[in-house]
Amino acid sequence: MAKKGDKMYKICIDPGHGGKDPGAVNGKYQEKNFTLDIAKKLAFFLESENEFKIIFTRTEDIYVSLDDRCSIANKNKCDFFISIHINSATNPAANGIETLCYEEFQSKNLAKYIQKALISATGAKDRGVKITNMLYVLNSTKMPAVLVEAGFISNQEDLELLIDNYYQDKIAGAIALGICDYFEIQTENKVFVTAPKRYKTIDEIPDYAKESVKKMCDTGAIKGDGESLDLSEDMLRLIVIFDRYINKG
């Protein structure tokens, strides 16, 4: 593994699926597009630290086999392999973020740093670090490897968050922060990742919460006319939960 001060850390970023393989699908939304967007953002954050060289398994919407993904990482002698995915389940209530890794010390340690940063940045349900030897890209790469499941495309609230460009920034920034923390690299991204977004107008609010907030404004439960709000993401979630509760049945 690269040593700090000797050379740059070489990180292979693997956006899951692509091309003829869309991955998990919910309506018009496909996993392959989310993974590529987040992967590119992750590369931007890591490269901004001047400590990392990035190797991609794909940078566009093309199909890359699992074997080729591993070969790219192995032939480039990468120090770590980070695979980005979006989860799916038959139960639409399933939600949250998890990080998977092979039974290997460095992989487990990196996974813990990444998972901690992701939950801290997003407030998502913590599904934890999971050990598995069933994923080809984890057991066929010759370096420590982790796979991030950054939310459930099958869960409406997770999906609405994943659609939001700022939320994708938080996911990518948190993964970058976890990697930097693992390598004990001080990073400017920590401020970016933890800085909460404030929604000032109805138009800025993600679709999953827009109707609930509008109703609250119309009834006077929220002061303002929809053009002078100051709502955090946590507030949006509470508003949606409250709206569903009072309107259930």
What are these regions (language model features)?
Residues 16:
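Extracellular repeat turn/loop positions enriched in glycine and acidic/polar residues, especially those
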